[in-house]
Swiss-Prot record:
This is Phosphoribosylformylglycinamidine synthase subunit PurQ. The keyword Secreted does not apply. Residues 3-226 form the Glutamine amidotransferase type-1 domain. The active site is at 86 (nucleophile), 199, 201. Part of the FGAM synthase complex composed of 1 PurL, 1 PurQ and 2 PurS subunits. It comes from Methanopyrus kandleri (strain AV19 / DSM 6324 / JCM 9639 / NBRC 100938).
Amino acid sequence: MVRVAVIRFPGTNCDLEMAWAVKLAGGDPEFVWHEDGGLDDFDAVIIPGGFTYGDYIRAGAIAALSPILEEIRECAEDGRPVLGVCNGMQILAEAELIPGTLTVNVGNRFICDWVYLRVERTDTPFTTKYQEDEVIRVPIAHAEGRYYYENPEEIEDNVVFRFCGPDGDVSEEYNLNGSVGGITGVVNDDGNVLGMMPHPERAAHRLLNSDDGLRLFESLVEWCRS
């Protein structure tokens, strides 16, 4: 059985949905409190969304200082998959485990909506069950989700997901938070650490209005098994 650690911080609030999605994909999720640590026996690590430490200073800044981030860094260096969703992506960015940073949305407002994403890479542990340029539908819910990188052309190979229209067109019309290049999911240079602002765990069953996110977790579990 593929063991997946779901990390909990004060203010985490998407952990149950994340564990449920991992189970649907055939994995064995286990909650790990950030102060407890102990990730050696896990095949993959997930940092779910929420508002860790109330988003004080800025989203993810305090959580990124937790000692468990050093364990997560070691997991990444070992080649194990690490996924950070929404606040999890913010934490990964603060810990410099993925390129770029997240800042407040254009308009300085919280955005909660369904969006379309274009899959840019299918060679990561998280996207093998998608097709390149496939359009998927998942929700977003964040206030500080605008991705920024000073020279985005330098990280073209790191981009995994972009905001797009239903036909796959990338334009500012569909870029709800103002992210540079419509980027909303990136990996590290090794491809095994993914940060993404949209919530695939909230689109893991047809009863949730979309099951497009389930394949991300199926990709993860299958990759770990192989």
